[in-house]
UniProtKB/Swiss-Prot annotation:
<keyword id="KW-0472">Membrane</keyword>
<feature type="modified residue" description="Phosphoserine">
    <location>
        <position position="337"/>
    </location>
</feature>
<feature type="compositionally biased region" description="Low complexity">
    <location>
        <begin position="321"/>
        <end position="333"/>
    </location>
</feature>
<feature type="modified residue" description="Phosphoserine">
    <location>
        <position position="455"/>
    </location>
</feature>
<dbReference type="GO" id="GO:0070064">
    <property type="term" value="F:proline-rich region binding"/>
</dbReference>
<dbReference type="InterPro" id="IPR013606">
    <property type="entry name" value="I-BAR_dom"/>
</dbReference>
<dbReference type="GO" id="GO:0030175">
    <property type="term" value="C:filopodium"/>
</dbReference>
<dbReference type="Pfam" id="PF07653">
    <property type="entry name" value="SH3_2"/>
</dbReference>
<dbReference type="GO" id="GO:0016020">
    <property type="term" value="C:membrane"/>
</dbReference>
<comment type="subunit">
    <text>Homodimer. Interacts with CDC42 and RAC1 that have been activated by GTP binding. Interacts with ATN1, ADGRB1, DIAPH1, EPS8, SHANK1, SHANK2, SHANK3, TIAM1, WASF1 and WASF2. Interacts with ENAH after recruitment of CDC42.</text>
</comment>
<dbReference type="GO" id="GO:0051017">
    <property type="term" value="P:actin filament bundle assembly"/>
</dbReference>
<dbReference type="GO" id="GO:0008093">
    <property type="term" value="F:cytoskeletal anchor activity"/>
</dbReference>
<dbReference type="InterPro" id="IPR036028">
    <property type="entry name" value="SH3-like_dom_sf"/>
</dbReference>
<comment type="function">
    <text>Adapter protein that links membrane-bound small G-proteins to cytoplasmic effector proteins. Necessary for CDC42-mediated reorganization of the actin cytoskeleton and for RAC1-mediated membrane ruffling. Involved in the regulation of the actin cytoskeleton by WASF family members and the Arp2/3 complex. Plays a role in neurite growth. Acts syngeristically with ENAH to promote filipodia formation. Plays a role in the reorganization of the actin cytoskeleton in response to bacterial infection. Participates in actin bundling when associated with EPS8, promoting filopodial protrusions.</text>
</comment>
<dbReference type="GO" id="GO:0005856">
    <property type="term" value="C:cytoskeleton"/>
</dbReference>
<feature type="modified residue" description="Phosphoserine">
    <location>
        <position position="347"/>
    </location>
</feature>
<feature type="modified residue" description="Phosphothreonine">
    <location>
        <position position="361"/>
    </location>
</feature>
Length: 521
């Protein structure tokens, strides 16, 4: 290698060191600063994501409390849990990004500046030393040759000249070898730094791949089930349908707050105390087998609430005779559809209180009237035992006893009849019995009323017709604070409709078509 090439390689070696110190390290510091900004932004995303999924959990809690959207609440919980796991994987990636990349690069770049400065200085010093030794040998050889040319005996300096030539060759070889090694070392130092950066970035990429793989695995497994859960917004879950059917199949129900029933301001199922056993009232005869044709639409034992103002108040009703009786065939159809038909009401403006309708009632049920017409007297079978205790106005019976009804309609969930076994007469809770068909089979009588039961109206208005005493000591003020769960120890309260327990949950209110469109998602 010629001297000029050695000098050129020396300049290249110095340029490599200077490139690392003047370009690579500043660029690496800028990379670290940008990485810290990126880490800070991802940490902000993580913090925001926690708040976002906490809110999603709250939405899931709301949905889980609804009878119609409970499974969607479970879906929202699953979504929050899946994304929490994905977020945990993201946090692992952030830890790797901070610990394996930013921290180590920051430590390396601070140490590297001093190391490279020392390495470059050492190389330059050694290269200069070897170059000076070579220059000195060359200068000595030049002097020797001048002396040899002016001497009368040139052979005298020939041996010494050969020694200098050998020394110069050795010095030049050492210098060239050192410069070559120095250049190789400089390139190696540069490559090691870039490899370190790539290696740490690969570690971050590996954690990033695990993060995305985890997210893909979880979402691919759960997403089809989530999409299936919300595929049909109009589908009511079977559980909610069964709940509605159970409520619809119960004759009694829970009294809405604000309702009271009789003239004495007692709860509907609270009988009037101090009465004696009732004989069959003489006023009953005109009602047996004769019902007004205006009761054509099947209406359950009564309505109260915001829609009940279409009906006459109980206190204002007079003893009137029905005009005509519905055809037997029509009455039979109404009786068959009794359990599947909701009350038909007019659409009226809702009110904020039930107080204005506490003394109002509906016409008598068409299906039960039809039963009276066909059979003369309707018979029921006890499905629960009932003890009257010391109260002489109540009728005691045991499960399986048969009772003949002596009035056409139940009043406020209480019916009046005669036990075929004991021949005793008195009031009893109608929900404790099943109505017997013509063939002797029993069927469960149902009531979808939303307020007070329909009654015999003016017949029961008379002061000489006594009602049973209070229903097991419950007061009208106790009902508003009770829930449906409090009545599971016996059949639903005969005072209030069972269907009203879940009616508000399903938004069974009169709304305009425009409101429906706005509410639809």
């Amino acid at each position: 290698m010629s001297l000029s090439r050695s000098e050129e390689m020396h300049r290249l070696t110095e340029n490599v060191y200077k490139t690392i110190m003047e370009q690579f390290n500043p660029s690496l510091r800028n990379f670290i600063a940008m990485g810290k900004n990126y880490e800070k932004a991802l940490a902000g995303v993580t913090y925001a994501a926690k708040g976002y999924f906490d809110a999603l959990v709250k939405m899931g809690e709301l949905a889980s409390e609804s009878q119609g959207s409970k499974e969607l609440g479970d879906v929202l919980f699953q979504m929050a849990e899946v994304h929490r796991q994905i977020q945990n994987q993201l946090e692992e990636m952030l830890k790797s990004f901070h610990n394996e990349l930013l921290t180590q690069l920051e430590q390396k770049v601070e140490l590297d500046s001093r190391y490279l400065s020392a390495a470059l200085k050492k190389y330059q010093t050694e290269q200069r030393s070897k170059g000076d030794a070579l220059d000195k040998c060359q200068a000595e050889l030049k002097k020797l040759r001048k002396k040899s040319q002016g001497s009368k005996n040139p052979q005298k300096y020939s041996d010494k000249e050969l020694q200098y030539i050998d020394a110069i060759g050795n010095k030049q070889g050492e210098l060239e070898s050192y410069v070559s090694d120095g250049y190789k070392t400089a390139l190696t130092e540069e490559r090691r730094r870039f490899c370190f950066l790539v290696e740490k970035q690969c570690a971050v990429a590996k954690n990033s791949a695990a993060y995305h793989s985890k997210g893909k695995e979880l979402l691919a497994q759960k997403l089809p089930l989530w999409q299936q859960a919300c595929a049909d917004p109009n589908k009511i879950p079977d559980r909610a349908v069964q709940l509605m059917q159970q409520m619809g199949n119960s004759n009694g129900s829970i009294l809405p707050s604000g309702l009271s029933a009789s003239k004495s301001n007692l709860v509907i199922s609270d009988p009037i105390p101090g009465a004696k056993p009732l004989p069959v009232p003489p006023e009953l005869a005109p009602f047996v087998g004769r019902l007004s044709a205006q009761e054509n639409a099947p209406v359950m034992n009564g309505v109260s609430g915001p829609d009940s103002e279409d009906y006459n108040p109980w206190a204002d009703r007079k003893a009137t005779q029905p005009k005509s009786t519905s055809p037997p065939q029509s009455q039979s159809k109404l009786s068959d559809s009794y359990s599947n038909t909701l009350p038909v009401r007019k659409s009226v403006a809702p009110k904020n209180s039930y107080a204005t309708t506490e003394n109002k009632t509906l016409p008598r049920s068409s299906s039960m009237a039809a039963g009276l017409e066909r059979n003369g007297r309707m018979r029921v079978k006890a499905i629960f035992s009932h003890a009257a205790g010391d109260n002489s106005t109540l009728l005691s019976f045991k499960e399986g006893d048969l009772i003949t009804l002596l009035v056409p309609e139940a009043r406020d969930g209480w019916h009046y009849g005669e036990s075929e076994k004991t021949k005793m007469r008195g009031w009893f809770p109608f929900s404790y019995t099943r109505v017997l068909d013509n063939d002797g089979g029993d069927r469960l009588h149902m009531s979808l009323q939303q307020g007070k039961s329909s009654s015999t109206g003016n017949l029961l208005d008379k002061e000489d017709l006594a009602l049973p005493p209070p229903d097991y000591g419950t007061s009208s003020r106790a009902f508003p604070t009770q829930t449906a769960g409090a009545f599971k120890q016996r059949p639903y309260s005969v005072a209030v409709p069972a269907f009203s327990q879940g009616l508000d949950d399903y938004g069974a209110r009169a709304v305009s078509s425009a409101d429906v469109e706005v509410a639809r998602f």
